[in-house]
Regions:
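Phosphate-binding P-loop
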Residues: 1-8
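Hydrophobic anchor at the beta1->P-loop junction of P-loop NTPases
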Residues: 11
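Conserved lysine of the Walker
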Residues: 19
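Hydrophobic positions on the alpha1 helix immediately C-terminal to the Walker A/P-loop
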Residues: 22
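Conserved substrate/cofactor phosphate-moiety recognition/catalytic segment
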Residues: 27-68
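Conserved nucleotide-sensing/catalytic segment adjacent to the nucleotide-binding pocket
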Residues: 52-98
Length: 177
């Protein structure tokens, strides 16, 4: 199997901002355009749907599982789209060591990352979430501060169809380079 120079589209924001919707939309649009891509879903969301609250006491485990989900596709497809970037593990980290480890793992892919902050546009849906709308908006602020404070370059798009279309166009342009 040939090793591909994979672009990782990392969607950042708090819960309910449209990361999963955007990831699914961008994935579908790219796939329909014949682009070899994969959607890497959020491990933590799987645990919410399983009613597994115990796992949320171990952010190290969650971050490791998410990292593995991304790494198993890296180099095998042209584009990975994820609604749970490895660096989000640092935002939710309960120790400084985990924060540093999450950032170090994320930075392994630095040359391949397209980091995107989703600006909240849609109505908040609490179903499948552990946070209230207010808490989710606070996490939006924390995530953006985290990106800025850690010198992680990113672009912002609105969490709506128009914003996701801009992202699809951006990815297609990057693939031409």
């Amino acid at each position: 199997m040939e090793h591909k120079n994979t672009i990782i589209v990392n969607l950042f924001a708090g819960p309910g901002a449209g990361k999963s919707t955007g990831a699914a939309y961008v994935f579908a649009k790219l796939k329909l355009a014949g682009i070899d891509c994969e959607y890497v879903s959020e491990f933590a969301k799987d645990k919410v749907w399983e009613n597994n609250s115990e796992v949320f006491k171990n952010q190290f485990y969650i971050t490791g599982k998410q990292s593995f989900k991304i790494s198993r596709c890296f180099g095998k497809v042209d584009v990975i789209i994820t609604d749970s970037p490895i660096a989000l593990g640092a935002v939710y980290a309960d120790t400084e060591g985990l924060k540093l480890a999450s950032l170090q793992e994320f930075n392994k892919y630095e040359k391949n990352n397209l980091n995107v902050f989703i600006e909240r546009k849609k109505k908040y849906n609490p179903n499948g979430r552990n946070q209230t709308e207010e808490e989710a908006k606070e996490i939006d602020i924390s995530v953006k501060k985290f990106l800025v404070n850690n010198n992680i370059s990113f672009v912002s798009v609105y969490g709506d169809e128009e914003g996701y279309d801009v992202l699809v166009k951006t990815v297609k342009e990057l693939l031409k380079k």
